[in-house]
Design a protein with these regions (language model features):
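Conserved Radical SAM active-site core
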Residues: 1-90, 94-102, 115
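Repeat-unit-sized solenoid/scaffold elements
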Residues: 54-65, 69, 104-105, 156-174
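Residue-level signature of transmembrane alpha-helix interfaces in integral membrane proteins
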Residues: 75, 79, 108, 149-150, ...
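Surface-exposed cleft-lining segments at the edges of enzyme active sites
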Residues: 99-107, 133-138
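Conserved C-terminal portion of the radical SAM core fold
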Residues: 112-173
Length: 178
């Protein structure tokens, strides 16, 4: 409950600045491992943008993991960070099928919107990586789905694809669940 309190989030940016100011050596700052930095509320709060401004100010690099084309709002900052240190945007992709995407990933950018964002980031010189996960048995594990995503990754010229769970076994209980 305390974690979700607005006051906790209001202190996030000053705490980040204090931590960055004290670091002796710049490094890559990661965003998005626990929650997407571009949730819809970000449009109002702008915490991600403020964090990126601090990362730029103190000369750090950045890596972001997102499912949102909203990342393009901060393209100007991402380019500057990439020029002075390094910036990598990682985009999670689950399915090539737009209708399935809307069912299993409601409230996030569609696969098509994410691929368009990847191309814009590429054209801006920002390295991109795709997380191809999760692969769900009988949902998105078809050859057509995997090939569709891989073809789009090739077109977007992503620098890498991270994939895990392709060897999923259906132990007792899993088969019934899926």
């Amino acid at each position: 409950e305390k974690f979700m309190a607005k006051e906790s989030w209001d202190r996030a940016i000053p705490l980040l600045e204090e931590a960055l100011r004290r670091k002796r050596k710049p490094c890559m700052i990661g965003m998005g491992a626990m929650t997407d930095p571009y949730i819809p509320l970000e449009e109002e709060l702008c915490h991600t943008r403020q964090a990126l401004e601090l990362i730029e100010k103190y000369g750090f690099g950045a890596t972001l993991i997102t499912k949102s084309a909203r990342v393009l709002r901060d393209l100007d900052l991402l380019k500057r960070i990439n020029r002075q240190a390094k910036c990598v945007v990682q985009m999670t992709l689950t399915t090539y099928d737009e209708a399935l995407c809307r069912k299993i990933e409601p409230g996030v950018s569609t696969t098509k919107e994410r691929f368009e964002a990847l191309k814009i980031l590429r054209d801006a010189g920002i390295p991109t990586v795709v997380w191809l996960c999760p692969i769900l048995p009988f949902v998105n594990d078809t050859e057509e789905n995997i090939n569709g995503i891989l073809d789009d990754c090739a077109e977007a010229k992503v620098k890498g694809i991270i994939c895990f769970g392709m060897g999923l076994t259906l132990r007792e209980g899993n088969r019934e669940y899926f």
